Swiss-Prot record:
GO terms for biological process: mRNA processing; negative regulation of cell adhesion; positive regulation of cell migration; positive regulation of endocytosis; protein ubiquitination; regulation of cell adhesion. This is E3 ubiquitin-protein ligase Hakai. Residues 148-206 are annotated as: HYB domain. CDD domains: RING-HC_HAKAI-like.
Amino acid sequence: MDHNDNDLQGTNSSASLGGLDVRRRIPIKLISKQTNKTKPAPRAPRAMNRMPAKTQAGDEEEFDFNEEERYECKGGEMFGNQRRFPGPIFWDYKINLLGEKDDTPVHFCDKCGLPIKMYGRMIPCKHVFCYDCAILHEKKGDKMCPGCNEPVQRIEQCVRGSLFMCSIVQGCKRTYLSQRDLQAHINHRHMRAGKPVTRPPLEPVHPPIAPPPAEIPERFIMPPEKHHMSHIPPKQHIMMPPPPLQHVPHEHYNQPHEDIRPPPAEMSMAPPPPRPVSQDTFRISTRKHSNLITVPIQDDSNSGAREPPPPAPAPAHHHPEYQGQPVVTHPHHIMPPQQHYAPPPPPPPPISHPLQHPPQAAGTPHMVYSQAPPPPMTSAPPPITPPPGHIIAQMPPYMNHPPPGPPPPQHGGPPVNVSAPPPHHYNPNSLPQFSEDQGTLSPPFTQPGGMSPGIWPAPRGPPPPPRMQGPPAQAPLAGPHHPDQARYRPYYQ
């Protein structure tokens, strides 16, 4: 057995035994023929690598059986020799792969380019490399991520399939531990650019809707600066309720509003004055809401500046009368007519209104109240700008109702002003306050005579035709103004 072991070792380990193997093969073939059973015995050990012991110890039958095995083993050895000296291998034959596809994505390390089985995740920047590269990079003393050059606080070890990498934008490659976190990152970092685009259009949409309020705010802003009064509350009132109403009046008042703005700048303009009057009316109403009487006094100068233009559109005497009249009365007149009148009627009525309103201030406050509360009117001069919003809100209905002639006392032409509410809003005491404010507002309004009945008739006749012609309802309103004014004159006087 020892001899066999040596043979085995020799055949496996030494090349010299290879020659012996070759010699042994020859007798094996002879043995297979079974010509001489005795001769092969000595050669058998040569030809047999591991089986010689069996052949020697076993019977001939066993030897034959073993011989076949030797043959097989010999073939194996021959293949073994080929393995030792490999030749060209051909892979052009088909291979059928059995198994299921693994949906887990495989990422490649940006450092070594090999597929990552264990991730090394850079914590602050969330970029990943294979764990070996990440650790090696850290050992080098570099605390910067090799991908983004951001400082690295620590490195996390993650298993393949536990990370979700962002591939929406090339070069992002941030990784997250859940699909939800990845989606949140995409929405925040990559989809945000698109969302702003949608938002800007929305913003523009809102501005168009709010333009009427914007216009009113501009007017309000101008007077508030001058008056330093609490115009913000009136503006708020105007902004909140008026927008819908403003839209309606704007259709009629679009031009008047535009005119109103210029008139304040250009007091001499005749057409603008009526519209400024409407502004004054609005201001008064705003004051009414704010219940600030003292503030209007500061605004008187502003209101006066704007109010004088309204008389210009009215007949010439209206202007002088207005100058004589206190500014307060003029604003009052303007306030009720504009509120009751639709945007179109305001220009002519403002002229007549100043006439009517002064008498109202003196005699019957209820008349003025119909359109705007007199107390706000007295203090209205400063808040005049904010009231336009409220007045506009009221005006739209009045604009629709301009035809009614019964309220001529306020606007003469537009009977809407005739409504009883104005008296309630107006306070006789507030009228005198307006007269005081009138002096501050402007020279034309400073005159106390503004209250005189004479002023009323003058604006009724001449101003209505020019202004009223623009708005169809104004011309008829002018006529009613005179009779209504006559009725109210005794009260105001």
